[in-house]
Design a protein with these regions (language model features):
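Internal amphipathic alpha-helical repeat/solenoid segments
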Residues: 1-60, 80-92, 102-109, 125-129, ...
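Boundary/linker elements of alpha-helical solenoid repeat scaffolds
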Residues: 20-33, 45-46, 62-72, 134-139, ...
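Alpha-helical repeat/alpha-solenoid scaffolds of the HEAT/ARM/MIF4G superfamily
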Residues: 77-118, 139, 143-221
């Protein structure tokens, strides 16, 4: 079973058999989260929640998010912290994201006040992605920061709505994950854009004051 959860970030419909197996496995897992045990199924959980929402295909991203939301609605405890850590970590792109793309999107946003259209079929993006990953299975072209932020914030707001306890856990995660002051500007800005997008939602609004205080301390350091 675990082999079908390998390479979720790079799976594409082009490899029909493998892709369908991965999709089916995620669908089954998402419908049976109540049967999962954190200790007995640690490796399975690690593989699913380790999927990059920046790099994976749209269908895979949707199923991974649904898995996390379903998991949190039936399990709390340390699983809640683990899942929220993974989602907040996804505010920022992983290793393998095309170099310069985050900076380009920030520059566009600063100039026009709008993020680039979240399209994933640009040949430029494909070329950058090929050079960044440098392996045989390149997977789908990466999505933009704007598109990924919508996916991640949507998942977290669902969890906040379904699991009221999650707000207490998330408050600490949001502050702890703020990039270090030495991090490049684009990463710091992307994290804060995602965090503020979250706290401006009805579900995330109770976290707004705490985030503002944390960001102020971060700026004064």
């Amino acid at each position: 079973m675990l082999e079908h959860l390998d390479g979720l970030s790079t799976a594409t419909p082009g490899d029909e058999n493998t892709y369908l197996h991965k999709r089916l496995m995620l669908e089954v897992l998402g419908e049976n989260v109540s049967s999962l045990d954190e200790r007995l199924h640690e490796e399975l959980l690690r593989r699913v929640m380790g999927t990059s929402l920046w790099l994976c295909h749209e269908d895979i991203a949707r199923l991974v998010v649904q898995f996390c939301v379903n998991l949190m609605s039936t399990h709390t405890g340390s699983m809640l912290a683990t899942c929220l850590e993974m989602l907040v970590e996804s505010f920022l792109p992983p290793r393998g994201y095309p170099a310069g793309r985050l900076e380009d999107e920030l520059e566009t946003f600063m100039r026009s006040g709008q993020s680039p259209s979240p399209m994933r079929n640009s040949s430029v993006d494909m070329d950058e992605d090929s050079s960044a990953r440098g392996d045989g299975d390149l997977g789908p072209p990466p999505r933009s920061a704007a598109e990924t932020t919508v996916i991640v914030v949507g998942a977290i707001t669902q969890i906040l709505t379904l699991v009221p306890l999650s707000a207490t856990v998330l408050r600490g995660v949001l502050l702890r994950r703020i990039p270090h002051k030495t991090a490049v500007k684009a990463r710091q800005c992307q994290y804060l854009r995602a965090a503020f997008a979250l706290v401006e939602t009805p579900a995330g609004r109770p976290l707004r004051d705490g985030l503002l205080r944390g960001v102020l301390r971060h700026l004064l350091d």
